[in-house]
């Protein structure tokens, strides 16, 4: 933990968990969608569900989905901005068994019809943890540049990606792998120390067995 974790982020109030963290959750979901969002369905669990209106969590999540930062004054008028942008957003208080108290399950649809589902929690001080992407278990914070790579589970798939990153001077800080079943769809998650260029990301996308690459800028 560093001093900024204790002090908390620069943000529009009232709470780092309910505002700054919620904005970041929306930002990450938008990055994973990869295009302008036209509709959002958000399931809120725990304290998010019970206090989201009073603490402005709805405005914060909505702002993140629209690409605003946690210190953007427009968070206060997020609903007006969403109407201007013709973004349809629905919040549903509920319960996600076993989830952190400040958890949201965010389902987005983009302008081309692409969809994504992201489940994550605001864990305090403006920090977040993403637990699921489209139903697959992951664990990343968004504090580092992050690569999510969907691929066919096959020998050599991981090595092909990590070798290409190493050849281009990209150091991996953390790595995890989730697969639905042996030989099926899998997801590599890598937090990296420096940002891979677009050309490198395209080279990874062209590797055998790669289905999708999502880059989340810190």
What do these predicted regions represent?
Residues 66-116:
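Contiguous domain-boundary segments centered on the initiation and propagation of an alpha-helix
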Residues 89-94, 118-218:
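A conserved regulatory-domain signal marking ACT and ACT-like small-molecule sensing domains
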Residues 1-10, 37-42:
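Short, hydrophobic/aliphatic alpha-helical segments
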Residues 30-41, 75, 101:
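Non-transmembrane, aqueous-exposed alpha-helical and coiled segments at domain scale
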Residues 51-59, 101, 185-191:
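Short glycine/threonine-rich loop-to-helix capping motif typified by GTGT followed
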Residues 8-26:
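Conserved phosphate/anionic-ligand binding catalytic regions in large, soluble enzymes, centered on
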Residues 41, 45-84:
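A structural-propensity feature for long, helix-poor, extended segments
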Residues 4, 33-35, 81, 95-100, ...:
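Solvent-exposed alpha-helices and their adjacent loops that cap or buttress functional pockets
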